């Protein structure tokens, strides 16, 4: 298996991308193609003492996509960028999956253009995993599609449910529709129509649909898959991230207030470290673009080498899972005539 890594994508690239990709090749024994400026990639490998790791191939690309580039046009304007070259390699079958911490919009555009959507899937969706009260919850869509149809929400539910089952190991994932109330009469016309489609799929045993869930219920573990349009999902995701940072800052302020509270912190430091670890995204690695015919993983823009390594691990698991074939087998239940 060969995993393509965009070595120049992300806030901490090329160091984190090259380092993480090389660590993944060493740890998981799969071949990793590092796409970027050869001399820069080689220098990072040398600095980290990873030049001799087996399974690493440097693929030349002399430009890069930055976070301010127009997602819709950048891959055409910058054909020699690391992301564009990475997608060309994926399309040509030179690699089995792609990992990038680069521009999210450009990555989704490239995934659709070069990877292609699975036949019958209307739109690809970004599906990050977030911590919740009883483990993890997958949010789908988290920003790829700001405007959706009810059929798209139905497809997001199937895609994320299959991923949660086959890659995350969740048995009969509970699917909830993010809404402004739990009653089946709640929501705007889109949510009401989507609810009817999801309930039908649940009644037929195709999905484990648990009904509407409010935004506050998502981090409390009300479902394993939270289905929403990309606008709602992105707001939900950023709100949870903001609350986590706020809590961390406030707790630190309380413990640093006096000598007594500082001593108290020393007594519960282990517990605080465990609390922070719950929100550690490095161990998750990245979020998949679901509905695409080839695995594409979006690592966080600020990913360090551990996050990139785990994004590669997730790409390997995705490739081995048979999920894309499972989507094709179930596509008849995801379409509305």
What are these regions (language model features)?
Residues 1-42:
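N-terminal phosphate-binding or glycine-rich loops at protein starts, especially the Walker A/P-loop
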Residues 3-15, 144-154, 298-303:
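Short, glycine-rich nucleotide/cofactor-binding loops
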Residues 6, 35-36, 59, 100-102, ...:
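Short beta-strand segments
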Residues 12-17, 80-93, 97-111, 118, ...:
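Short glycine/serine/threonine-rich phosphate/pyrophosphate-binding segments
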Residues 15-16, 28-33, 38-39, 146-215, ...:
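Glycine-rich phosphate/diphosphate-binding loop of Rossmann-like nucleotide-binding domains
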Residues 49-95:
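Phosphate/nucleotide-donor binding subsite
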Residues 89-108, 186, 191-193, 197, ...:
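Glycine-rich phosphate-binding loop
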Residues 112-126, 131-139, 222-226, 230-337:
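Glycine-rich phosphate/nucleotide-binding loop
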């Amino acid at each position: 298996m060969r995993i393509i890594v965009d070595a120049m994508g992300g806030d901490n690239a090329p160091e984190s991308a090259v380092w993480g990709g090389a660590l993944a090749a060493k740890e998981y024994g799969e071949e990793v193609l590092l796409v970027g400026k050869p001399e820069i990639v080689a220098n990072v490998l040398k600095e980290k003492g990873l030049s001799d790791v087996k399974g690493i191939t440097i693929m030349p690309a002399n430009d890069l996509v930055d976070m301010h580039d127009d997602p819709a046009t950048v891959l055409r304007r910058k054909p020699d960028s690391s992301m564009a070259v990475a997608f060309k390699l994926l399309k040509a079958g030179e690699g089995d999956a792609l990992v990038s911490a680069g521009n999210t919009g450009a990555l989704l555009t490239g995934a659709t253009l070069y990877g292609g959507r699975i036949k019958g899937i209307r739109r690809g969706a970004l599906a990050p995993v977030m911590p919740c009260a009883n483990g993890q919850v997958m949010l789908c869509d988290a920003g790829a599609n700001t405007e959706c149809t009810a059929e798209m929400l139905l497809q997001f539910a199937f895609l994320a449910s299959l991923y949660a089952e086959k890659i995350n190991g969740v048995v009969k994932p509970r699917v909830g529709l993010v809404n402004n109330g739990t009653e089946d009469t709640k929501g705007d016309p889109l949510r009401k129509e989507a609810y009817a489609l999801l309930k039908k799929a649940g009644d037929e045993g195709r999905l484990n649909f648990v009904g509407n869930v409010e935004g506050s219920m998502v981090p409390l573990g009300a479902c394993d898959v939270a289905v929403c349009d990309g606008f709602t999902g992105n707001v939900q995701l950023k709100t949870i991230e903001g609350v986590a940072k706020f809590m961390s800052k406030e707790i630190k302020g309380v413990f640093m207030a006096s000598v007594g509270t500082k001593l108290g912190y020393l007594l519960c430091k282990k517990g605080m470290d465990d609390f922070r670890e719950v929100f550690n995204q490095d161990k998750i690695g990245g979020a998949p673009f679901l509905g695409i015919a080839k695995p594409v993983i979006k690592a966080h823009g600020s990913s360090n080498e551990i996050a990139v390594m785990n994004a590669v691990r997730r790409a390997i698991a995705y490739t081995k899972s048979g999920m894309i074939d499972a989507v094709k087998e179930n596509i008849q239940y995801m379409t509305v005539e």
